[in-house]
Amino acid sequence: MDRESKNELWDQWVSETILTDITSPVTPDPVPMVDESGSQLEMTDEYDSYRLGRGNGDYLYLLYVLDEPVSGSSDIIPVYIGETSQVSSRLLDHFRKLRNSLPTSEWKDDGSWGSYGKYDHIATVFEKANSPLYVWVVDVNEIETGPYGYSTYRQELEAKTVGLVHSHPQFNRVFANRDFVPNRVAHEMGKVGPDWVDLENDSPNEEAVVAADNAGDGVSGTSKADLWHEWVEQTIHKEIHDPEGEDPIPLFETDDDLVVELTEVGSSTVLKRSEAIDTRIRQEGKRCVHRTGVKDGPNGLLYVMYQLESDPPSPEQIIPRYIGKAEAYGKKNELSANFEEIAKDRSGTRSFARWGDGSYWHVGELSDTVFGVDSKKLSWASELFEQGTHQLKEQTYLWIRAWDPEKYTGPYGYPAYLAEVEALLIGLAYQTNPHQLLNHHEVPNGAPANQKQFEFDPSST
């Protein structure tokens, strides 16, 4: 049987979930959101009843419009996808903020980041569509599998469905999500405001063009752990075993006892990154940016902080500690502040593709925690360092690459853009190594990283 494309995965999932509820005589769907009959906009009785009928839980929800008459999944047009544990209050908040964003003729670009926000976007669709705005809610625990055919949880399901919608050729201008969507899109939206939404002349974005009719590479894994190990084997493991490569690259400069060297940045004492990782970050960052902006090609860096159970390791012995990304595009300015030092060949490394030694970046925050200045990276300090010291418990490495969906396949075998693949990998790594992974976002609230009481006695030197 031929493998489905990402477009077909979305269409099939919609057919099995939303469309089934819309066409069922025993569900209230479709549920309209806005009552326009009075002097001011109100919630419909159906919407109010629908949201109040649900207690706390694990919910995914979709705001959508319909291309009627509805005959198939392509007639369901997604406007916004979200997840929450408290759907009643979340839907009330969405209605109020939508109402406050109307009419869009009063929108003005105030020059701030995110000036044309998601509620402005949803309001624009509401005004321009020939359909009411509807809502659909599902308890994720009642869904056996996500659209890729594997078990899932609400934070991961949001990322998966957003990724499929953004990669779909039909929904580029109508879809209002900002998370799990490339920063480039928010940047482009902000330049034109409500004129971004053109329901009659939509055209595919570059991610949809890459994904179009691409069935990707088949995966053999029967579990999410299998998928993680397959992806690691094709990337980190492969590069570690490349005799001409430099991986694994230690994150920090250390002595033989794994005591991390220190450096002074202004008045702050900072953990010193290894020269090899600084070179790698600059090298990969240069593939994404030039002096004044972003190059065609990779839109940023994907990174995995990891440790090894053996040297040389098998894929199963490469233990992920943190997964993240640094997008070259900013949401307001084309060039992200995270890449300015790299783009302009500056010697400073304050931001440094998010691995900088400034107080709001990974190494800076970790240094502040290790030396008792702050506690933002408490979980990292507790798990990576011996108490009261700047000595690593184990050697810690960083794999970082300019992410090119046409070079690297996503973990489910399909092309996956940077803002999408980060969350997909976090979901797989969490399933495989839940007690080692230090990501706090895109994992369940009950994940060890979010429940463990981390402690660290700061180093005095």
Named regions from a protein language model:
Residues 1-79, 84-321, 325-461:
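Boundary/linker segments flanking structured domains
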